[in-house]
Amino acid sequence: MNKNYKVVFSKARGALMVVNELTSSVQAKGTKTVIAGAVASLVAGGAMAAEPSLNGGVFNWDGAESRTSTSIYASDKQVSSVPTYANVTEVNITDGSFKPVYGSALAFAGTQKITIKNSTISGAQNSALFLNGHKGNSNVTADGFSNSIVVLDNVTIKDNQSSAGGGLYMYGKAEMTVNSGSFEGNKALSNKKNDQAYGGAAVVKSGKVFFKDVLFKDNVAEASNGYATGGAVLVDITTSIKENGKDSVGDVTFKITKDMTYTGNNV
């Protein structure tokens, strides 16, 4: 049933109130006094950010606003760190805004189906997206588990940094498709002596990535006391992941179906 509501100022409460018009009276000076019905204080800052849900291994997060680093791992993860969310087989993130104050924005490991749509990731200090199924420097045989399937639709990855990666760091058994969106202003930085900064927009150390109509702009790799490689996308063929007895090296494909200009990607 439709109802009419009016916003008034309550001197007694010192705040704005939402008042049910059908159950209110008016004092002589025109101030509404609530007798019964729906009343709610208007809180400055708007609605609370949407919370993620995890049910039966399926992780859903619509309208996310996050300022922390979130790790989401499957049960067959090949890393030892404890995740924010465990035993996740499917991830669906839509209309998100991620600005972590430390670390990566989103980290994934293990066999998962991951879909991120219409989202922005910025300000991360250890790459925006981190897909890592690798156990440090040890060899991993990937024959026993399936690929992760990753889809990014209209995702903006900008102003992130790391010594390796910048926007994206991928070192696992995965197939990724990136449709539209952009990588802008991401940096691979290193100030350590004889150290390497590699990446800028992305590092693909294993797995397959297909970029379709994705903009790359002003991504850089810089090393003040060492050396830098990359600029936009760096495909690193040194890997400790093996499949069918062979090194599982990175494989990247670009497809352009419209006019695009790539500028400012430098080492």
Where are these regions (language model features)?
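Surface-exposed loop/turn motifs in large extracellular/passenger domains
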Residues: 52-102, 106-126, 131-161, 169-193, ...
